Amino acid sequence: MLTSQKVSRVLLHSSFLKTPVSTQSRSFVFTTIATTLFGSVLWSKNNVLASKMENHELHYNDPNDKYRKLLEKKRGPAFTRAAAEYPGQVRLYNYEKFLMFLGSSIGSFFHPEENKYIVALGESTAIEPVLKRLQHAMLSDPTGRQILRERPRITSTSLDLDYLRSLPDNTIGKSYITWLDREGVSPDTRVPVRYIDNEELAYIFQRYRECHDFYHAITGLPIIIEGEISVKVLEYMNIGIPMSGLGALFAPLRLKPSQRKRLREIYYPWAIKNGLYSKPLINVYWEKILDKDINEFRREMGIEQPPDLRDLRKEYFAKKRREKELKAAAAAATVTQRQRQQQRATATAANATSASSANVKPSNTAGAM
């Protein structure tokens, strides 16, 4: 009996011990693995922190360090200009550009014949958004892209002027050289661009400047003040150069009433219409169409030739001379008529005096008798 009880106790005790031991051993394994992994992470972080402490790098980041570096970057040396992007470029600060605009505006208004004022005004008003728009227009056109790629220049060297003189009269090249000879100008009179910052934008403005005489040639407008204003209006409506718009707005203020009347009634309407509805002139590769018929070119571009300004001026001055002659003749006739009236009055007075003298003599004789 005792033996069976002991055996049962032993079996019970052994079964009781086996389960907890097995459970404890599995828990220990998992705990050991987790502790090892977590400890390795902590140990590696501790190693990193210890290394930073040893190298004096812990908590060394200055919160003002970025701000200090930004100030040093912005400050830089005082009055130091960036390097030029193209030959002859002159870098200007914004206040210098404003002063140049102010001075050239006043100079252009009172002395439009001085090219230096016109040049400075053109570049000081050729702001980047305007030139970027022209750049986009050229890049959107196959011919415009070719011009930007090849960078042609219009000078007496690049153009064979003798060849242009040999072309037929109805060609663009012959019309161009005829206009140059008549007005006494040369392709070399266009001053290089100096004050525009971007190199490609500077070339675009240079291209516009050198093509100006072609606009005169295809329209037939001379370089006298009315012709220049008319071409400026055409340029502004077609290309959008700010200086052209300023010239169209303020230049007529110094003209005579007869000149303003011609612009208002004839050339402003013509320039606005043709500038708006014609194709972009900035995309014309003039050097490659010099032998093209000028009338065909006008039709393709949608440009009408305006009335001849020189003929209108001749007619006006001839009319003024006739009016002056008529006034002089009328004044002379009036003087002659007055002289005749005065002569008649003098003759009448003389006759009256002689008649009265004749009447007085007989009465005196009778009294004496």
Curated annotation (Swiss-Prot):
It is a peripheral membrane protein. Pfam families: Coq4. Its EC number is 4.1.1.130. It is an enzyme of class 4 (lyase). Residues 329-360 have a biased composition (Low complexity). It is found in: Mitochondrion inner membrane. Residues 329-369 are annotated as: Disordered. Pathway: Cofactor biosynthesis; ubiquinone biosynthesis. Belongs to the COQ4 family. Component of a multi-subunit COQ enzyme complex, composed of at least COQ3, COQ4, COQ5, COQ6, COQ7 and COQ9. Lyase that catalyzes the C1-decarboxylation of 4-hydroxy-3-methoxy-5-(all-trans-polyprenyl)benzoic acid into 2-methoxy-6-(all-trans-polyprenyl)phenol during ubiquinone biosynthesis. This is Ubiquinone biosynthesis protein COQ4, mitochondrial.
